[in-house]
């Protein structure tokens, strides 16, 4: 990578300086800081790809800019949840997003999040 932004479409993990690939899902990939002990970092880099999936299958062709749009929607919802619901007594909901200061190659399609224990449920 030469610092240019990429449309992340392939099944191959990206080589991101300072980050080590740890997991690939159907449409998102996870990286941890390269200088952290494997599995022990407090944060993860979540990168949304342009891949599309349905019924547990990745389909072709990828959708251009899908990863960037998915990331913007995710950040918007987390922001709304953190603000609480207007006119209701609902408390704001804490989220796990730490930063959007990510490598330039994945800017707009990635976020740094707190590492949490996952409860594997899919609806």
What are the residue ranges of the model-derived segments?
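Active-site loop/lid in soluble adenylation, ligation, and acyl-transfer enzymes
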Residues: 2-123
């Amino acid at each position: 990578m030469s610092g240019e932004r990429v449309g992340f479409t392939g099944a191959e993990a990206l080589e991101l300086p300072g980050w080590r690939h740890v997991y690939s899902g159907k449409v998102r990939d996870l990286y941890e800081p390269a200088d952290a002990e494997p599995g022990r970092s407090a944060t993860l880099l979540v990168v949304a790809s342009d891949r599309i999936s349905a019924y547990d299958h990745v389909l072709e062709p990828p959708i251009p800019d899908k990863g960037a749009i998915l990331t913007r929607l995710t950040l918007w919802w987390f922001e709304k949840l953190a603000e609480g619901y207007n006119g209701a007594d609902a408390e704001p909901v804490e989220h796990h997003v730490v930063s959007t200061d990510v490598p330039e190659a994945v800017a707009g399609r990635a976020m740094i999040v707190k590492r949490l224990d996952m409860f594997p449920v899919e609806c």
